[in-house]
């Protein structure tokens, strides 16, 4: 049996609990009474946050059992899907975590079939890499994240505030290039950023935020990407969409799913043209085997392949 605990599996946020017979949802008190010899794993949405940590008691309990954790998060490819439409949405499902560096997905060297299906369903086009000569009309697009999001755990746990990291990264970019910098705030959490401080750093702040939903930035992201010479981020999932658009990306943390097809230091920004030639093919195939529909999750194939450690 795979146990979900109300709270660490966040039903109130709109997550849908699997209806396969192997899954059981209960409250925390009931979970503590379970015979752990009959529990194979736990299922949760997201992970415990360095800031969002109000479910720490549940996560500590699950940790102490030593059981595997199936972690459900938003999909790797998010274009044209909507979290509020679960019947057509995809979800990333990993073992013990959801990030590129800590999650286990058994997806290395995956075949092409799943990518071909997702590409068609989500209408994703893989555009050639932009080898764009910088003329002064383009900009470095700095993709920001929700300041309290669990994707920033590695930064926050190291004792660095995200605001401070943003300011330092802008200064670090300035130390290697005088190219224009445009900031794209997280569309859902614009009010969580200190716009006054950002304005003092001489950067442009995007005003393109129309059309987003809980899964993606909508058309506004593509408007910002249109004249982007390159992107910089800690680990934003928008970098995945940028890479599909052919925009070179500097990812500054290895938790980002676009890490294998991106640069990892800012010095590349000193060039007038980035000759970006990462091969994205196998990366696309592998990413496709991290995300699943609710129908697939309910069929049992997803948890079986994770818990069995293979592609069953």
Give the ranges of each region predicted by the language model:
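N-terminal pre-catalytic "stem/leader" segment of glycosyltransferase-like enzymes
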Residues: 1-49, 149, 309-312
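Short, well-ordered secondary-structure micro-motifs within conserved domains or adaptor modules
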Residues: 33-73, 232-234
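Active-site donor-nucleotide binding/catalytic segment of nucleotide-sugar enzymes
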Residues: 130-190, 282-295
């Amino acid at each position: 049996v795979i146990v979900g605990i109300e709270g660490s599996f966040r039903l109130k946020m709109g997550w849908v609990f699997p209806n396969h017979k192997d899954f059981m949802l209960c409250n925390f008190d009931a979970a503590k009474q379970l015979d752990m010899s009959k529990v194979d794993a736990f299922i949760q949405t997201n992970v415990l946050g360095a800031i969002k940590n109000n479910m720490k008691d549940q996560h500590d309990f699950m940790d102490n059992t030593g059981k595997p954790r199936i972690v459900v998060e938003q999909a790797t490819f998010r274009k044209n899907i909507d979290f509020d439409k679960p019947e057509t949405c995809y979800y990333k499902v990993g073992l013990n975590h959801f990030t590129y560096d800590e999650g286990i997905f058994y997806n290395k060297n995956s075949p092409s079939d799943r990518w071909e299906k997702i590409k068609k369903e989500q209408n994703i086009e893989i555009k050639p890499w932009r080898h764009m000569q910088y003329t002064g009309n383009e900009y470095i697009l700095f993709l920001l994240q929700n300041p309290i999001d669990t994707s920033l755990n590695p930064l926050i746990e190291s004792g660095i505030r995200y605001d401070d990291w943003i300011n330092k990264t802008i200064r670090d970019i300035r130390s290697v290039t005088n190219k224009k910098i445009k900031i794209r705030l997280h569309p859902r959490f614009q009010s969580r950023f200190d716009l006054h401080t950002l304005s003092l750093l001489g950067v442009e702040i995007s005003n393109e935020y129309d059309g987003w939903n809980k899964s993606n930035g909508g058309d506004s992201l593509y408007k910002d990407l249109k004249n982007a010479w390159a992107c910089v981020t800690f680990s934003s999932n928008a970098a995945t969409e940028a890479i599909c658009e052919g925009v070179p990306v500097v990812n500054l943390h290895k938790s980002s799913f676009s890490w294998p097809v991106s640069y990892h230091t800012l010095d590349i920004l000193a060039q007038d043209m980035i000759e970006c030639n990462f091969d994205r093919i196998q990366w696309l195939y592998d990413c496709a085997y991290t995300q699943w529909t609710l129908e697939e999750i309910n069929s049992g194939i997803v948890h079986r392949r994770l818990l069995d450690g293979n592609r069953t």
